[in-house]
């Protein structure tokens, strides 16, 4: 009897800049249409999501700006395009909700992360409202204040 292969689990890559630049309001899980060489590269975590975003066009969602570095051993017979536009698989209801929200000023649809769900690659996309410069500074101040508080609590425990 053949041994069952374990499915890879966990996050492949995250877009930390998206959380810095946007207030995340709603999250969606989307499937992806990928080529074989892309899946092999994803198993090796060769993915960058820094400037990736979602474009809604003709009732479909497309992911632009994600970069999958091709493995030399996996893409020998195919001309690999690392930054090609990839189709996202969403329900009609989710697509309609995203399309209506993106029409409003200041809202955008961005990719937050890619992860394995059983043997499938999923993309977590989010509807976010763009942060202003002062919002980013406020977030940084709150984070620093939280760190100072944790540091004070930790030091207080050591003094006793």
UniProtKB/Swiss-Prot annotation:
The UniProt GO MF terms for this protein read: RNA binding
- This chain belongs to the protein called SsrA-binding protein
* Pfam families xrefs: SmpB
Concerning PANTHER family, the annotation shows:
SSRA-BINDING PROTEIN (PTHR30308:SF2), TMRNA-BINDING COMPONENT OF TRANS-TRANSLATION TAGGING COMPLEX (PTHR30308)
RNA-binding is among the record's keywords: yes
Positions of the region Disordered?
131-160
Q: Which family does the UniProt entry place this protein in?
A: Belongs to the SmpB family.
Where it mainly occurs, coarsely classed, is cytoplasm
Organism of this sequence: Pseudomonas fluorescens (strain Pf0-1)
**Gene that encodes the chain:** smpB
Q: Which UniProt keywords apply?
A: Cytoplasm, RNA-binding
Record localization: Cytoplasm
Function, in words? Required for rescue of stalled ribosomes mediated by trans-translation. Binds to transfer-messenger RNA (tmRNA), required for stable association of tmRNA with ribosomes. tmRNA and SmpB together mimic tRNA shape, replacing the anticodon stem-loop with SmpB. tmRNA is encoded by the ssrA gene; the 2 termini fold to resemble tRNA(Ala) and it encodes a 'tag peptide', a short internal open reading frame. During trans-translation Ala-aminoacylated tmRNA acts like a tRNA, entering the A-site of stalled ribosomes, displacing the stalled mRNA.
What are the record's GO terms for cellular component? cytosol
Q: Which GO terms describe its biological process?
A: trans-translation
Which InterPro entries did the record assign?
Answer: SmpB, SsrA-bd_prot, SsrA-bd_prot_CS
Q: Does the keyword Cytoplasm apply?
A: yes
